[in-house]
UniProtKB/Swiss-Prot annotation:
Zinc finger ZZ-type: from-to: 48-104
Domain SWIRM residues, every copy: 461-548
Gene Ontology BP term (one): regulation of transcription by RNA polymerase II
Function description: Required for the function of some acidic activation domains, which activate transcription from a distant site. The exact mechanism of action is not yet known. ADA2 stimulates the acetyltransferase activity of GCN5 on free histones or nucleosomes, probably by opening up the promoter region.
Gene: ADA2A
Domain SANT residue range list: 106-158
Region (Disordered): 1-30
Domain of life: Eukaryota
Protein name stated in the entry: Transcriptional adapter ADA2a
PTM annotation: Acetylated in vitro by GCN5, but acetylation is not essential for biological activity.
Key words, A-Z: Acetylation, Coiled coil, DNA-binding, Metal-binding, Nucleus, Transcription, Transcription regulation, Zinc, Zinc-finger
Length: 548
């Protein structure tokens, strides 16, 4: 049995872009209701075709078909095969296989043999845990049905890992088909029988009490569903379950969005960290290549004792690496590191820096001990900061607590205004270059970007006493410069961020045609022309500007 068609496979689109191997019924509420209404009028239910002819689009479910052994997922009906149909890459000279009717129960009465094969193919393709893709591959079963059937028929089988086939061994195909028909007759319910409240399906109450007017228009009445003459009650339940899933999907996709609390944070765990919440796995685990150690290892009867012991040692090493991977994942989940820390977000910039520096000790402490350590360290920082503020206030002449608090508040406000001005002027080097290029930080000698509290309390004559030697290494943007550019910045005393901004402005203006020679660039910057010349020469060296 070949694998069924999926719309996402490019190979199928090459063979026949306009046709799909499996006919899928849309899960929209309108289509789901229409499918139930059609089943009511016809007197029986129609299942989506598992296989279709690639040429005439005939439903081949339960019929003999011819499968090409060369082309991927290419099937033909008997009529098209008999006349030698050729389509795209498929030729009538290709080898083929005759695929017989497998619409009979093999393991359980509610699963046909072809559905069993599709289930195993899907698990082999998508792996365990991707049950939504597995259900889409099978086509005629829901995700819950696939999980339940695999667990009961395979995982809990007395013949594990094989299913229990004791009731089908030795029986012919006709006998299996007859058994399937008998099981269908036994599950049949009398026509026009009213279901009692206890026998009503769980979704009936939801269908009855649906408050939405649009959904009520498409929901068929329960009496109509219960009074339909069908072969069995199980297929009827599947249709209603599909309708419920359709309504849930519709509510999620096109319904009203649920209001979210202003303070509620929804971290994009999968996007940011590559973590799958449902499978509880990372896309890239710690020591992700650990399996390569024993990927090609094989135990043979001809192995000597030394070789066997060596392979066992490899297995022990691999086991330890798996234990370390598990320990790290449990550490991340236990400490809730995938989500933003509300306590960290409530801290100031300096306190947040201390918080991050203490994270390295988390591996040596329990969660409660580490949290207590961080609180104590931050409290110590706050106390020291308060002592420094009070000492500075006393030096300024404050004698009471209220005067000191007023002085500290004004100081904080002034620092905030200065930092705001620095951020506003950061993008325009020409506006502040003439005033701030007197120190390696791009600020006046009596101003520091982190405030006076981050500097030692020394007398003014001793501040920046070692600025005779200019070195831009370690400054912001220095890692983006070459050695030649760093040397030029040291010689001209230009900050790396200012140099990069000047390069950007000069490059854009040269491309616009505003700067055609070196002297045209002087008007764009409020710095010495010699510094502009050096930056312009660097552009000429890179082949951007004109040397004139």
């Amino acid at each position: 049995m070949g694998r069924s068609k999926l719309a996402s496979r490019p190979a199928e689109e090459d063979l026949n872009p306009g046709k799909s191997k499996r006919k899928k019924i849309s899960l929209g509420p309108e289509n789901a209701a229409a499918s139930i209404s059609t089943g009511i009028e016809a007197g029986n239910e129609r299942k989506p075709g598992l296989y279709c002819c690639n040429y005439c689009d005939k439903d081949l479910s339960g019929l003999v078909r011819f499968k090409c052994a060369v082309c991927m997922d290419f099937d033909l009906c008997v009529e098209c095969f008999s006349v030698g149909v050729e389509l795209n890459r498929h030729k009538n000279s290709h080898p083929y296989r005759v695929m017989d009717n497998l619409s009979f129960s093999l393991v359980t009465s509610d699963w046909n043999a072809d559905e069993e094969i599709l289930l195993l193919e899907a698990i082999a393709t998508y792996g365990f845990g991707n049950w939504k893709e597995v259900a889409d591959h099978v086509g005629s079963k829901t995700t819950t049905e696939c999980i339940k059937h695999f667990n009961s028929a395979y995982m809990q089988s007395p013949c594990f890992p094989l299913p229990d086939l004791s009731h089908t061994i030795g029986k012919s195909k006709d006998e299996l088909l007859a058994m399937s028909k008998d099981s269908a007759v036994k599950t049949e319910i009398p026509a026009f029988v009213r279901l009692s409240p206890k026998e009503e399906l769980p979704v009936s109450a939801e269908i009855k009490h649906e408050a939405s007017g649009k959904v009520n228009e498409i929901d068929p009445p329960l009496s109509a569903l219960a009074g339909v003459k069908k072969k069995g009650n199980v297929p009827q339940a599947k249709d209603i379950i599909k309708l419920e899933a359709a309504k849930q999907q519709s509510d999620r996709s096109v319904g009203e969005k649920k209001l979210r609390l202003p303070g509620e944070k929804v971290p994009l765990v999968t996007e940011l960290y590559g973590y799958n919440l449902k499978r509880e796995e990372f896309e890239i685990e710690h020591d992700n290549d650990a399996e390569q150690l024993l990927a090609d290892m094989e135990f043979k009867d001809s192995d000597t004792d030394a070789e066997r012991e060596q392979k066992l040692q490899v297995l022990r090493i691999y086991s330890k690496r798996l234990d370390e991977r598990k320990r790290r994942k449990e550490f991340v989940l236990e400490r809730n590191l995938l989500y933003p820390d509300q306590y960290e977000m409530s801290l100031s910039a300096e306190e947040r820096k201390i918080y991050k520096s203490c994270k390295v000790f988390a591996r040596f402490q329990s969660k409660e001990e580490h949290k207590e350590l961080i609180k104590k360290v931050i409290e110590e920082h706050q106390i020291l900061r308060r002592i420094e503020d009070l000492q500075e206030a006393r030096t300024a002449g404050c004698r009471t607590t209220s005067d000191a608090n007023r002085f500290i508040e004004e100081k904080r406000k002034k620092e905030a205004e200065e930092s705001m001005l620095l951020r506003l002027n950061h993008g325009a080097p020409g506006s502040i270059a003439g005033k701030t290029l007197k120190s390696p930080r791009g600020l006046p000698r009596n101003l520091h970007p982190f405030g006076s509290d981050s500097l030692p309390k020394v007398t003014p004559p001793r501040i920046y006493s070692g600025l005779d030697t200019w070195d831009v290494d370690g400054l912001l943007g220095a890692d983006l410069l070459s050695e030649t550019e760093k040397k030029m910045c040291n010689e001209t005393r230009i900050l790396p961020v200012h140099y990069l901004k000047m390069l950007d402005i000069l490059t854009r203006e040269i491309k616009k045609g505003q700067i055609k020679k070196k002297s045209d660039a002087y008007s764009f910057f409020k710095v010495e022309p010699s510094k502009v010349d050096r930056v312009y020469d660097m552009l000429v060296h890179k082949g951007i500007g004109d040397s004139t």
